[in-house]
């Protein structure tokens, strides 16, 4: 699904088990139908799969939920947001990728904000305010407010945090920026 490789299931379990923090697993794998339920059996709090990597979305979402996990559905930039709508009532999170998945440090794709706006309207119309609308990719102090104003409420900030001189301070600044935009 993506050209690079990070952790296999066993290594992921070690990391998840060692953490006292809630863990969100975002699977960028070729066969989410198999991997989703396997990762749902770990101590992770939530498991997000990609629509594009799943042959039977309803079955896979149900299998993850059956393990007591929060369930997320992600889409790549080239995938229409409409594919998510039939599953909204089964989800705890909709993830809109704002870069092509696979590598950090890419530029934020502003054109994805129309998808975020559409998803936010659906969630409000269907009274699903507890479903998180997440962005992943190119999140920084310059882009987080754009995403928040479009309707996103949850953000994955990789390079902005890990390449900063003070990662903890950067997390605080990103949170403050997003919260200001959400007011």
Per-range role (PLM):
Residues 33-41, 79-91, 138-155:
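Catalytic cores of alpha/beta
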Residues 5-25, 63-72, 112-133, 174-183:
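Alpha-helix-loop-beta-strand connector modules within alpha/beta enzyme cores
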Residues 28-32, 52, 76-78, 99-100, ...:
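Active-site beta-loop-alpha junctions enriched in small/polar residues
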Residues 1-6, 10-11, 77, 85, ...:
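Glycine/Thr-rich beta-alpha phosphate-binding loop at enzyme active sites
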Residues 1-63:
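N-terminal active-site wall of soluble small-molecule enzyme domains
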Residues 39, 94, 119, 136, ...:
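Conserved, mostly hydrophobic/aromatic
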Residues 47-56, 95-107, 150-170:
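Glycine-rich phosphate-binding active-site loops on the catalytic face of alpha/beta enzymes
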Residues 23-27, 47-49, 71-75, 94-96, ...:
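Hydrophobic faces of well-ordered beta-strands that scaffold small-molecule active sites
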């Amino acid at each position: 699904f993506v050209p690079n490789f990070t952790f296999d299931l066993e290594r992921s379990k070690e990391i998840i088990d060692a953490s006292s923090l809630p863990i969100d697993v975002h699977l960028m794998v070729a066969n989410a139908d198999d991997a989703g339920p396997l990762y749902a059996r770990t101590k992770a709090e939530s498991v997000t799969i990609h629509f594009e990597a799943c042959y039977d979305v309803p079955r896979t979402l149900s299998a993850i939920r059956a393990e007591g996990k929060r369930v997320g559905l992600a889409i790549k930039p080239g995938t229409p947001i409409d594919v998510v709508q039939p599953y909204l009532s089964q989800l705890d999170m909709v993830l809109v990728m704002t870069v092509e998945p696979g590598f950090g440090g890419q530029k934020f794709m502003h054109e994805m904000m129309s998808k975020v706006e559409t998803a936010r309207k659906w969630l409000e119309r269907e009274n699903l305010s507890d479903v998180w609308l997440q962005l992943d990719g190119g999140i920084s102090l310059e882009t987080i407010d754009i995403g928040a104003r479009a309707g996103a409420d949850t953000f994955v900030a990789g390079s902005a945090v890990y390449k900063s001189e003070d990662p903890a301070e950067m997390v605080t600044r990103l949170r403050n920026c997003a919260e200001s935009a959400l007011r």
